[in-house]
Amino acid sequence: MRLLLLVPLLLAPAPGSSAPKVRRQSDTWGPWSQWSPCSRTCGGGVSFRERPCYSQRRDGGSSCVGPARSHRSCRTESCPDGARDFRAEQCAEFDGAEFQGRRYRWLPYYSAPNKCELNCIPKGENFYYKHREAVVDGTPCEPGKRDVCVDGSCRVVGCDHELDSSKQEDKCLRCGGDGTTCYPVAGTFDANDLSRGYNQILIVPMGATSILIDEAAASRNFLAVKNVRGEYYLNGHWTIEAARALPAASTILHYERGAEGDLAPERLHARGPTSEPLVIELISQEPNPGVHYEYHLPLRRPSPGFSWSHGSWSDCSAECGGGHQSRLVFCTIDHEAYPDHMCQRQPRPADRRSCNLHPCPETKRWKAGPWAPCSASCGGGSQSRSVYCISSDGAGIQEAVEEAECAGLPGKPPAIQACNLQRCAAWSPEPWGECSVSCGVGVRKRSVTCRGERGSLLHTAACSLEDRPPLTEPCVHEDCPLLSDQAWHVGTWGLCSKSCSSGTRRRQVICAIGPPSHCGSLQHSKPVDVEPCNTQPCHLPQEVPSMQDVHTPASNPWMPLGPQESPASDSRGQWWAAQEHPSARGDHRGERGDPRGDQGTHLSALGPAPSLQQPPYQQPLRSGSGPHDCRHSPHGCCPDGHTASLGPQWQGCPGAPCQQSRYGCCPDRVSVAEGPHHAGCTKSYGGDSTGGMPRSRAVASTVHNTHQPQAQQNEPSECRGSQFGCCYDNVATAAGPLGEGCVGQPSHAYPVRCLLPSAHGSCADWAARWYFVASVGQCNRFWYGGCHGNANNFASEQECMSSCQGSLHGPRRPQPGASGRSTHTDGGGSSPAGEQEPSQHRTGAAVQRKPWPSGGLWRQDQQPGPGEAPHTQAFGEWPWGQELGSRAPGLGGDAGSPAPPFHSSSYRISLAGVEPSLVQAALGQLVRLSCSDDTAPESQAAWQKDGQPISSDRHRLQFDGSLIIHPLQAEDAGTYSCGSTRPGRDSQKIQLRIIGGDMAVLSEAELSRFPQPRDPAQDFGQAGAAGPLGAIPSSHPQPANRLRLDQNQPRVVDASPGQRIRMTCRAEGFPPPAIEWQRDGQPVSSPRHQLQPDGSLVISRVAVEDGGFYTCVAFNGQDRDQRWVQLRVLGELTISGLPPTVTVPEGDTARLLCVVAGESVNIRWSRNGLPVQADGHRVHQSPDGTLLIYNLRARDEGSYTCSAYQGSQAVSRSTEVKVVSPAPTAQPRDPGRDCVDQPELANCDLILQAQLCGNEYYSSFCCASCSRFQPHAQPIWQ
């Protein structure tokens, strides 16, 4: 432009000037080139041509005036239906390409400021990216508009599809028109009394063009758009959308609103024409400022009657390779939807078409599989995975190809990586503390913790693969001078009562030089027996092991019992032992050596105290024993009896390698166990579980022990951690799991295993277990270390009570008599004060029967054979609980003097009874038949049924000689005999009776012929487990346990359709009850309802109709009990009761039922897509969803839809309501006229099926048919 302004000045010479003439440069254009190919094949592309500029300028510029390139429109014809968007095709070129470490599928983004940049958004993400500076020429600037991008700029395209054309469409969409072919419809919706929510503004008719709807002022209200069927296109169901262009009614509807947080007027505009009516609504939240609307309709009147309308095409089902689109096609008139058959005279528009037929691009990429487990859990390892090349065609089909095809792709994932680089956990010992003594042999302690990377504190389980360094070690100083404190025997400290804050721990301090009176003058030097422990804050690890004791410690932990009367000699010598020895106390919750001590219930001694053995320190220590006697060492003696152990579990002892192993010794005391509970040990010991030690039993009465016991004797805290725990006196170490090698067995009528003290074993894998406290007849908890221990060890309280108390068929626990006295016949009784009473001398075999409440029933066996003493046995007593070879009471000896131990070389099998015991059980249960014979080591139990050997997979012989039958079948009923394989031995008989569905109940006469069976309810959890041990005939039949149902079971069961559920019903009682399930008072019986052997009801493939209340009824022939269970079927919503078509005469009442299966359901009715509001006069909606329309009119005809909503679920069902004109007044019929049907006017079969003969209008066409059919009542219009 600067040059153009200067040119005139150069052409006008100044007057009188002699300046030389300047020569003008001549830059010219060359010829135009050919037109380039069109940028698109359809839909309006752009072609261009270019021309060169010939210039003589030496600076590289040109002075040619005009454009060097010109453009024109081409291929303006519309693309075929279903063709892909042109901008979307350009974004799809980047599909599968790596972008910031990921691969995306890209879609076009239209809301960027520069409309001609190629901005794309990844599918499923919320950001867009500019892939190119400019889109391909001919790409529309915005969807729904004709303007296109050329060289990165938006250029105008006229309605004649020509580039830079000035021709525009008028409001009627005529190119270059003057707007005379249509008429405008405009107005303002300014109603102010709007309810909160959706309010209809207007309905834009089908065929409308140049639509504009906007708010008069900004507000917090929103516009919404839906079709006449109630389906929302914009802002439906209280979901407000962002500004966008959306397809609706075969046009593009542009929605404009302020950004999030900005307040701007709502605006809608569309080109049209619309292919269906659009309902415009205002979501009102504040006063309406007014909404302006304007649209145009063609001057030609639409054809009257019904016509087809259709919505916009849906998105293509596939992005390439061929997909399909669908749209809604429906019949309308007067902006309302009607059934399709109303438009059947007109051709129906297509509702489905193909789309995106172009082939999918093939892409290749690397794909990696999952990582394999790391080769090391810590300290650095490696893991690998498979990496391979896959080829994808974009349609979801992938296949693996050669890696060479992906060789050029960047970023191949690694196939190997390092893992678990953190440092392994290891034990971290603290420095040793000071020695516990200043002279002599003491102990020093230290703390050992499990530490991880950077010294972080970890749980001890993280270091379980390594042996934990010892927490204590002996320390030796110079010999101490003989001081008064040597008179005290000091035990090891017990567990701390708390793990942090403030705890206490105890130890045993007793006089070591004789009775307590010998130490009376040395009380000032008595070491403390209680000290604080674990005083650190609770966020720090505990300093010493602790227990969780919920009881407050008593001021005197050792509660002395009354004096034990000792036999004959030196009875006073045992008096002080009974006072000091910890086993002479009734409280068993704090036994020494228990690592936790959390005995859940405080048990008080209800029966006689266990008999006491003379402690090893009864006699004063002599100078010959020296000050370093192993019994006074911190960890007691080694198994040899004289070497001091250097640590727990006989550490440092000679010849005890298996004791020092992790899981200790096998029962042979030589082999090393490979795991808890003697894992890896041989099961066969020839009946000798003590490695050659005979399985003899100790006498049940108190024995005067004047010699050293056979078993090792330790302090109470030590023997519980030995291989088989303590003997009955809590001091001596047992030689076997059933108290082998122990003397002084208590006289309680319980199995031997139930008389032993709890033993936590020698390992440290602590777990809560149960043991039986014979002195009170109850079970209590204790902490078990995971290996070794004795047989008084049970997994649950029920198992404990079943194994110990379950063997008694008298009272459940020792019952005190009128004087609180418990009576026994094993040579002595027990006085209320705990003193042993001398047995009365008996001259005959008869034994006096005691009353029932005084401690149990007694019986006498058959008369003994020649030279054999009569054998008496307590009611319910286990036969092996007594010394089989012991001397019988009443045979020789002075009264009040117990017989000395008598070990017989032969083993006599004692029988529980000659008459058969009775066991009752139901089909499918598990039954254990126990043999009460105490067989010799070389003898084995043999079982027979009805005299024949037993051979079946359901019959399994156990190690203890018992027989398990599972599952129980009808043919298992009969008489079972158990006996020894040795000749000349008697057998025990057990009568097994099968209880059927009618529940057989024994009469009192039948009960008197059989010993009472064990109550199956005592073995709760092991259905049908019963045993006849100790069952005897009695004149006092066992009272039946009252029937009881477990009311703690779930009362509400939720299920989904098709699910399999179980409803439990646990009952117990005697006789065992029968279970029946009922529903609505009737037994439940169907192939899908199955009653299980344990009483539960299993329902397969639950259906909606299964929901309701079920009753479990238990009956045992005497008592009855029941409980109900509600089954709730949480299925999908369903609507029933609404037929497809309802015909109602004009003026009658339409009753539309909408029965919805489900709870908390909201029901809404609509007619032709518009909500039906109850007005309280003609239209009513009942709470159950029924719609009532009184005085029906012709304008009420239409499609009624019932919609049910429950949470996120929704379901709807429609019915067509047809209104028929009332029949004319019926004329008196000619009696002589024939009564015939008129099939050309009505289908009489349908009228009969619908029971419409009561309607005079319909019955007039079907006289003959209705005469043969007399309706019972007037039909209800539905």
Curated annotation (Swiss-Prot):
Tell me which domain of life the UniProt entry assigns to the organism this sequence originates from.
Answer: Eukaryota
Q: What is a single molecular function from GO for this protein?
A: serine-type endopeptidase inhibitor activity
N-terminal signal peptide: 1-18
The answer to whether keyword Cytoplasm applies is no
Q: Where is the composition biased (Low complexity)?
A: 608-620
All copies of the Ig-like C2-type domain together span: 900-995, 1033-1128, 1133-1218
* BP GO annotations: extracellular matrix organization
- Which residue numbers delimit the PLAC domain? 1231-1270
Taken from the UniProt record, the cysteine pairs bridged by disulfide bonds within this chain are: C38-C74, C42-C79, C53-C64, C316-C355, C320-C360, C331-C343, C754-C804, C763-C787, C779-C800, C931-C978, C1065-C1112, C1154-C1202
Q: Which PROSITE patterns match?
A: BPTI_KUNITZ_1 (PS00280), BPTI_KUNITZ_2 (PS50279), IG_LIKE (PS50835), PLAC (PS50900), TSP1 (PS50092)
UniProt entry keywords in alphabetical sequence: Disulfide bond, Immunoglobulin domain, Protease inhibitor, Repeat, Secreted, Serine protease inhibitor, Signal
Q: Which residues form the TSP type-1 domain?
A: 26-80, 304-361, 362-421, 423-481, 484-539
Q: Extract the ranges annotated as region (Disordered).
A: 544-632, 805-901, 1014-1042
Annotated GO CC locations = extracellular region
* Compartments it resides in: Secreted
| UniProt keyword Disulfide bond present | yes
Indicate, by first and last residue, each region the UniProt record lists as having compositional bias (Basic and acidic residues): 582-599
Entry's SUPFAM superfamilies? BPTI-like (SSF57362), Immunoglobulin (SSF48726), TSP-1 type 1 repeat (SSF82895)
Specify the BPTI/Kunitz inhibitor domain's residue ranges: 754-804
Which PANTHER family does the annotation name?
A: ADAMTS A DISINTEGRIN AND METALLOPROTEASE WITH THROMBOSPONDIN MOTIFS PROTEASE, PAPILIN
Spell out the family assignment given in the record's similarity comment. Answer: Belongs to the papilin family.
Q: What is this protein called?
A: Papilin
